[in-house]
Amino acid sequence: MSIKSDKWIRRMAAEYDMISPFEPDLVRQVNGEKVISFGTSSYGYDIRCADEFKVFTNINSTMVDPKNFDEKCFVDVKGEYCIIPPNSFALARTVEYFRIPRNVLTVCLGKSTYARCGIVVNVTPFEPEWEGYVTLEFSNTTPLPAKIYANEGVAQVLFFESDEVCEVSYRDRGGKYMGQVGVTLPRS
């Protein structure tokens, strides 16, 4: 299993629509304004956060239970940025829609720009033949409010191609997050 380069990422995006919309270069400015970079890098793809967020709140005094998740735990926010309360978190989704080939697995890591501000980005691997918008989790580990910018880079996806094709893919087993759109909450 080896990590894939910018050349491979560009080819897969063009030939297989693996990432849509796709940015073939690393973008650092938009309309003359600095942004947190996104697009194709040397050995990965920097994904963007869309403008829809679900911010964790305790106003309804509910319990967090991954097997029986209550949507009242979140407040919906839409905009150019999202403010995450101290020691809290928010969910969002990517701008990009992914279609992962059967012989590929991805690992996603948060960008250092956010990590250096105490903001942790968590994303699980994209499994073989999974497709959809990626649900992102932002944890604000600081005692201060934290800002997340929509339509700018938040994490980097690394692509690993296997030497052999898996016997059962995410699609084959009917994975519960297949084809997800919008910000997707836990499913049991």
Swiss-Prot record:
* Gene Ontology biological process terms from the UniProt entry: dUMP biosynthetic process; dUTP biosynthetic process; nucleobase-containing small molecule interconversion
A GO molecular-function descriptor: dCTP deaminase activity
Q: Which reaction does it catalyse?
A: dCTP + H2O + H(+) = dUTP + NH4(+)
Chain positions recorded as dCTP binding sites: 111-116, 135-137, 156, 170, 180
Active-site residues, Swiss-Prot/TrEMBL? 137
Question: Which EC number(s) does UniProt give?
Answer: 3.5.4.13
Domain of life, per UniProt, equals Bacteria
What pathway does this protein act in?
A: Pyrimidine metabolism; dUMP biosynthesis; dUMP from dCTP (dUTP route): step 1/2
- Keyword Nucleotide-binding found: yes
Keywords (A to Z) from UniProt:
Hydrolase, Nucleotide metabolism, Nucleotide-binding
Oligomeric state and partners?
Answer: Homotrimer.
PANTHER family, sorted: DCTP DEAMINASE (PTHR42680:SF3)
Please describe what this protein does: Catalyzes the deamination of dCTP to dUTP.
Question: Which protein family is it in?
Answer: Belongs to the dCTP deaminase family.
Name this polypeptide is given: dCTP deaminase
Traced from the root, the source organism's taxonomic lineage reads: Bacteria, Pseudomonadati, Pseudomonadota, Betaproteobacteria, Neisseriales
